[in-house]
């Protein structure tokens, strides 16, 4: 392909709407254009990258026994009502009506469609295991679409569903997909980590996210400095808290005045104690009740863990009026002692505190020498706190480190959540009806393209890994009007393509500097410059985009040299 014949509308200025690097560079390098908020048109260069991503995904999934199908984007509301998710999914679900006033949605996921399909087609254990997948557009009505392809309202996804007769079979399918995803992202040339995660609205028992590591990542992950443990901050745990120290005497409960001291740090400083000796009491409203959550003063409540512990559908921090109504005191002076008709959920660390400090449920007052079990009894004691870098790894005890990541894939063990809700059953070896055991596995294809850029760029533009670059090499004749230069450039362009190197020829009548800037902006892994030396000395310049290394190579040796370099990029 020749640049003069292509639609590659590069921009010199950074578009005002672009907040993150990938969005800026995808616009500037002519990969995408905005159609509406969170909706983009993919131009030819982007399509080439997406095609390569799809191909890598297909090859690795098919290798594990996957079968590709294609499901509809428009899904009838009846399916979602049957599964119970029509109301759970909330305003992010694009809902629409047809001319007959029937409700539909644009699919953000396809659990309902695939499960109901299998319900009608699979009746025997002999028909499983099954691994069925599609690569399809998905839709989510984001409140505030931003960051280009990283948080859009229309996006491209690969979603796969596994169907097994039992949990042991699901474990095998899950491991197959874990291996496939590891191979996929390795082949894409990105640095990534699989991390333990929360299953969210999809549901299920076990899940891992695949995170591309990037400083601009929206998610924080914690990983062990010694072993393979890694989890996002919503899921991360640490070693269990130490038990009560029997050597410490429990003192008599007392009320003390703490005028104007509301935060754990302010109270601790005023009373001359460490912040960890203060118990923070946070009130939350679920879909059913108001609950009190207790953590140490130097910790924060992990709302995802709390939501899961409560088994609630929704969880929001209670407003000031609710706190006042429940406790009779303003926020900052509330505590668990004397609370009535309120469920108390305590973090495990709280139960190890002796002679702690809590709010007295009275303006400008706190209680000291508070001891769990003696002075208050939580209904639930679980891990409900945020874990931070520097704490010990739950597997080996080494230090946890923090990194930022962009989620590009997630795998779930759904179990029988959807098969039971939707009646997808099979007959086992004994002729007994059993629910099908399911898993689901997603990859954000368009998101992976953006994430790769967030990890691979410099001041001049994108630095594509060779495996997913739109073209692997670009041949640039310095003076296209020089017949001798153009002849060498044309021959080299043809020879590289014949050798299997995806090569583009910049035959435009532009200044060399303009061509070089465009090549760096777009991010071709290799740039081959055909200048006057190619004519007079028979050498061309081969420049590697990532390292900037430049080699002068004879024209006749240039193709073998490029074939040698390419696998390292």
Swiss-Prot record:
<dbReference type="InterPro" id="IPR002314">
    <property type="entry name" value="aa-tRNA-synt_IIb"/>
</dbReference>
<dbReference type="GO" id="GO:0006433">
    <property type="term" value="P:prolyl-tRNA aminoacylation"/>
</dbReference>
<comment type="subunit">
    <text>Homodimer.</text>
</comment>
<dbReference type="GO" id="GO:0005829">
    <property type="term" value="C:cytosol"/>
</dbReference>
<dbReference type="InterPro" id="IPR002316">
    <property type="entry name" value="Pro-tRNA-ligase_IIa"/>
</dbReference>
<dbReference type="InterPro" id="IPR036754">
    <property type="entry name" value="YbaK/aa-tRNA-synt-asso_dom_sf"/>
</dbReference>
<keyword id="KW-0030">Aminoacyl-tRNA synthetase</keyword>
<dbReference type="InterPro" id="IPR036621">
    <property type="entry name" value="Anticodon-bd_dom_sf"/>
</dbReference>
<dbReference type="GO" id="GO:0140096">
    <property type="term" value="F:catalytic activity, acting on a protein"/>
</dbReference>
<dbReference type="InterPro" id="IPR044140">
    <property type="entry name" value="ProRS_anticodon_short"/>
</dbReference>
<dbReference type="InterPro" id="IPR006195">
    <property type="entry name" value="aa-tRNA-synth_II"/>
</dbReference>
<keyword id="KW-0547">Nucleotide-binding</keyword>
<dbReference type="GO" id="GO:0004827">
    <property type="term" value="F:proline-tRNA ligase activity"/>
</dbReference>
<dbReference type="GO" id="GO:0005524">
    <property type="term" value="F:ATP binding"/>
</dbReference>
<keyword id="KW-0648">Protein biosynthesis</keyword>
<comment type="function">
    <text>Catalyzes the attachment of proline to tRNA(Pro) in a two-step reaction: proline is first activated by ATP to form Pro-AMP and then transferred to the acceptor end of tRNA(Pro). As ProRS can inadvertently accommodate and process non-cognate amino acids such as alanine and cysteine, to avoid such errors it has two additional distinct editing activities against alanine. One activity is designated as 'pretransfer' editing and involves the tRNA(Pro)-independent hydrolysis of activated Ala-AMP.</text>
</comment>
<dbReference type="InterPro" id="IPR004154">
    <property type="entry name" value="Anticodon-bd"/>
</dbReference>
<keyword id="KW-0963">Cytoplasm</keyword>
<dbReference type="InterPro" id="IPR007214">
    <property type="entry name" value="YbaK/aa-tRNA-synth-assoc-dom"/>
</dbReference>
<dbReference type="Pfam" id="PF00587">
    <property type="entry name" value="tRNA-synt_2b"/>
</dbReference>
<dbReference type="InterPro" id="IPR023717">
    <property type="entry name" value="Pro-tRNA-Synthase_IIa_type1"/>
</dbReference>
<dbReference type="InterPro" id="IPR004500">
    <property type="entry name" value="Pro-tRNA-synth_IIa_bac-type"/>
</dbReference>
<dbReference type="InterPro" id="IPR045864">
    <property type="entry name" value="aa-tRNA-synth_II/BPL/LPL"/>
</dbReference>
<comment type="similarity">
    <text>Belongs to the class-II aminoacyl-tRNA synthetase family. ProS type 1 subfamily.</text>
</comment>
<keyword id="KW-0067">ATP-binding</keyword>
<dbReference type="InterPro" id="IPR050062">
    <property type="entry name" value="Pro-tRNA_synthetase"/>
</dbReference>
<dbReference type="GO" id="GO:0016740">
    <property type="term" value="F:transferase activity"/>
</dbReference>
<dbReference type="GO" id="GO:0002161">
    <property type="term" value="F:aminoacyl-tRNA deacylase activity"/>
</dbReference>
<dbReference type="InterPro" id="IPR033730">
    <property type="entry name" value="ProRS_core_prok"/>
</dbReference>
<protein>
    <recommendedName>
        <fullName>Proline--tRNA ligase</fullName>
        <ecNumber>6.1.1.15</ecNumber>
    </recommendedName>
</protein>
<dbReference type="Pfam" id="PF04073">
    <property type="entry name" value="tRNA_edit"/>
</dbReference>
<keyword id="KW-0436">Ligase</keyword>
<dbReference type="Pfam" id="PF03129">
    <property type="entry name" value="HGTP_anticodon"/>
</dbReference>
């Amino acid at each position: 392909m020749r640049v003069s014949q292509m639609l590659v509308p590069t921009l010199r200025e950074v578009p005002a709407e672009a907040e993150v690097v990938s969005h800026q560079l995808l616009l500037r390098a002519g990969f995408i254009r905005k159609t509406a908020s969170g909706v983009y048109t993919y131009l030819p260069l982007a399509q080439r990258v997406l095609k390569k991503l799809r191909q890598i995904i297909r090859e690795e999934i098919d290798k594990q026994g996957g079968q590709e199908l294609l499901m509809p984007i428009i899904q009838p509301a009846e399916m979602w009502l049957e599964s119970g998710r029509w109301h759970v999914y909330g305003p992010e679900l694009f809902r629409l009506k047809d001319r007959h006033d029937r409700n539909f949605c644009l699919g953000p996921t396809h659990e309902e469609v695939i499960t109901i399909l299998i319900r009608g087609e699979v009746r025997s254990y002999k028909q499983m295991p099954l691994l069925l997948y599609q690569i399809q557009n998905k839709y989510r009505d984001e409140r505030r679409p931003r960051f280009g392809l990283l948080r859009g309202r229309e996006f491209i996804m690969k979603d796969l569903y596994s169907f097994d007769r039992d949990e042991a079979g699901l474990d095998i399918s899950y491991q197959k997909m874990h291996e496939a995803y590891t191979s996929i992202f390795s082949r894409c040339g990105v640095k990534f980590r699989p991390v333990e995660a929360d299953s969210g609205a999809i549901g299920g028992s076990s899940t891992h996210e695949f995170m591309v590591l990037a400083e601009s990542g929206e998610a924080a992950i914690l990983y062990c400095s010694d072993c393979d443990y890694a989890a996002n901050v919503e899921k991360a745990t640490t070693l269990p808290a130490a038990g009560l120290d029997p050597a410490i005497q429990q003192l008599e409960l007392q009320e003390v005045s703490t005028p104007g001291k509301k935060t754990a740090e302010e109270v601790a400083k005023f009373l001359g104690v460490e912040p960890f000796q203060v118990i923070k009491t946070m009130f939350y409203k679920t879909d059913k009740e108001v609950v009190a959550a207790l953590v140490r003063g130097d910790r924060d409540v992990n709302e995802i863990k709390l939501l899961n512990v409560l088994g609630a559908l929704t969880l929001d921090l209670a407003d000031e009026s609710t706190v006042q109504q429940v406790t009779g005191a303003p926020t900052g002076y509330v505590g668990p002692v004397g609370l009535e008709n309120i469920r108390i959920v305590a973090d495990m660390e709280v139960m190890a505190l002796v002679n702690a400090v809590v709010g007295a449920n009275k303006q400008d007052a706190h209680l000291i020498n508070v001891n769990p079990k003696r002075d208050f009894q939580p209904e639930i004691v679980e891990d409900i706190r945020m874990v931070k870098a520097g704490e010990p790894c739950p597997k080996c005890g080494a230090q946890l480190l923090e990194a930022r990541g962009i989620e590009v894939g997630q795998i779930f063990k759904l179990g029988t959540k959807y098969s039971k809700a939707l009646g997808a059953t099979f007959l086992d070896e004994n002729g007994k009806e059993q629910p099908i055991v399911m898993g689901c596995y997603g990859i954000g294809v368009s998101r992976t393209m953006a994430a790769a850029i967030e990890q691979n760029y410099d001041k001049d533009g994108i630095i594509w890994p060779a495996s997913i670059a739109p073209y692997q090499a670009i041949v640039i004749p310095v003076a296209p009007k020089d017949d001798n230069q153009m002849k060498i450039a044309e021959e080299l362009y043809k020879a590289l393509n014949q050798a299997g190197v995806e090569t583009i020829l910049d035959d435009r009548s532009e200044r060399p500097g303009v061509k070089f800037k465009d090549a760096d902006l777009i991010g071709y892994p290799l740039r081959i410059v055909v200048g006057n030396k190619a004519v007079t000395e028979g050498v061309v310049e081969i420049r590697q985009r990532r390292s900037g290394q430049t080699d002068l190579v004879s024209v006749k040796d240039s193709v073998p040299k490029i074939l040698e370099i390419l696998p390292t990029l």
